[in-house]
Amino acid sequence: MRTPGAGTASVASLGLLWLLGLPWTWSAAAAFGVYVGSGGWRFLRIVCKTARRDLFGLSVLIRVRLELRRHRRAGDTIPRIFQAVAQRQPERLALVDASSGICWTFAQLDTYSNAVANLFLQLGFAPGDVVAVFLEGRPEFVGLWLGLAKAGVVAALLNVNLRREPLAFCLGTSAAKALIYGGEMAAAVAEVSEQLGKSLLKFCSGDLGPESVLPDTQLLDPMLAEAPTTPLAQAPGKGMDDRLFYIYTSGTTGLPKAAIVVHSRYYRIAAFGHHSYSMRANDVLYDCLPLYHSAGNIMGVGQCIIYGLTVVLRKKFSASRFWDDCVKYNCTVVQYIGEICRYLLRQPVRDVERRHRVRLAVGNGLRPAIWEEFTQGFGVRQIGEFYGATECNCSIANMDGKVGSCGFNSRILTHVYPIRLVKVNEDTMEPLRDSQGLCIPCQPGEPGLLVGQINQQDPLRRFDGYVSDSATNKKIAHSVFRKGDSAYLSGDVLVMDELGYMYFRDRSGDTFRWRGENVSTTEVEAVLSRLLGQTDVAVYGVAVPGVEGKSGMAAIADPHNQLDPNSMYQELQKVLASYAQPIFLRLLPQVDTTGTFKIQKTRLQREGFDPRQTSDRLFFLDLKQGRYLPLDERVHARICAGDFSL
């Protein structure tokens, strides 16, 4: 799209013809012709198709910016904002625990968090100290980090699935002075107790008898019952740019990293979600996501903390209870992530799926292949798909329901929100540079790395990084938009269409090249999963000795050994190109997922198609016979020797 050139040419022609003495109507008509001929018509088309969307997005951006500016000038923090909300509506339900039925009003959440703040100050903790929080998602989880924040103490929110070395690593890198763990996590803490050091204070919360408490652990609940519940006489000198808590990355590509969440980032994420999807003051939000991640704790719980919505928590997603919970608690907004929507679709059809009041589903990772099936099947009018990591400064949101899109950036107002797709070497993920040393922007339709220009003075564009300086530096590139600037590297490849809609491409390693073609793992996964009734599927490329590229391999959940590979292959041939059909199959009891329901492929890729690495059933596609054959050590050796044509 050559809008600057088109505009310049049309204005120049208008002036020239006017100087030659032609009537202005003729001059204008000629100038318009030059404009259209120079590519301007495409620009007008884009304006007509996207103006409404872009203006709404601009209004959201301005609204969030003004709210943040007001809170910064007032010296607010997230706890202060919450206290104002609690004072306005003390008796409204703030948090509901769907697992236990326990309900907390805003006054109760405020009182509990006040007790936490007073207790830890009495124990000698000072603003800036770190306390690790390790318990399942329930109201106490929110009250603990909120209370610590009231005292200026930074909470390190630990993934409840961590065990042994990763758990000890996360505790060590956080520099925590204390650990608060739930009774349900006692066994996990016991496994690493010798690695934690005697200086680490331990507090246990929840239903756990004194005889079951680990040595050197104090019972937190009785201590909180004795602590003052009045607001702190003097709040710590904290502001919107100070640290609120740490959230750990999922660790799918290595050990988890502690991402720094400052008060303004918490506000920004929650506010963008609230305004982008027009949430209402009387909404009830269903949050079954982990609270140790930003989707559940900021996008979800943030609606309670900042805007006063009621949030219904369930500590662990349950496909069979999802819609029952929504009906029971009159939920109007639900959250999803990863494969949750697919899990819901594969449940038996029940009447309750249509008796709910849910109008909006907010999240990320909804596959385009099941997008409309989900909205039509469950009667959910709006999907609020968004893209953004906890620490990133280039989040985007799909505000108008464009199927398959994870968000947009305006093609008209490109500089209002300075993010960009840049060309990269997809093997190394290093940005490519032009002759001036700047990154090369992608054209519509070209896949590129999403980057966001950094401005530490702007709460919408700052990048706070990680506790580890080296990890932070790896995510920053310089001279990206212009000489001397800096930008955040998302690590994710997206594609933008002509209208500015962006579509998520797989992370590096999730596409592979086979028979001269690029194979999208998500596309193959979606096809296989649909053929098999929304079964869990992981698709990845594996190297075969002496063969160029990588062969496709599919790991399929088959807990009851019911899958017939060759019946599946007959259907697969109808819907997948030959180069995309998996050469290898691995049938296993279940496919590993992360705590946020993303497929884990690291171990599967490492073990490949070697039967010595697994007891799972393996199959190999013999192209001559046109069928999958069992793959044992003898067949494996023949494949590696090149006896089969792949």
UniProtKB/Swiss-Prot annotation:
GO cellular component: basal plasma membrane; caveola; endoplasmic reticulum; endoplasmic reticulum membrane; mitochondrial inner membrane; plasma membrane
Regulation (activators, inhibitors): Inhibited by Triacsin C.
Keyword Plastid found: no
Signal peptide (UniProt feature, chain positions): none
Key words, A-Z: Cell membrane, Cytoplasm, Fatty acid metabolism, Ligase, Lipid metabolism, Lipid transport, Membrane, Nucleotide-binding, Transmembrane, Transmembrane helix, Transport
EC category name: ligase
Reactions catalysed, as given in the entry: a fatty acid(in) = a fatty acid(out); (9Z)-octadecenoate(out) = (9Z)-octadecenoate(in); hexadecanoate(out) = hexadecanoate(in); (5Z,8Z,11Z,14Z)-eicosatetraenoate(out) = (5Z,8Z,11Z,14Z)-eicosatetraenoate(in)
Name of this protein: Long-chain fatty acid transport protein 1
Species this protein is from: Rattus norvegicus (Rat)
High-level lineage: Eukaryota, Metazoa, Chordata, Craniata, Vertebrata
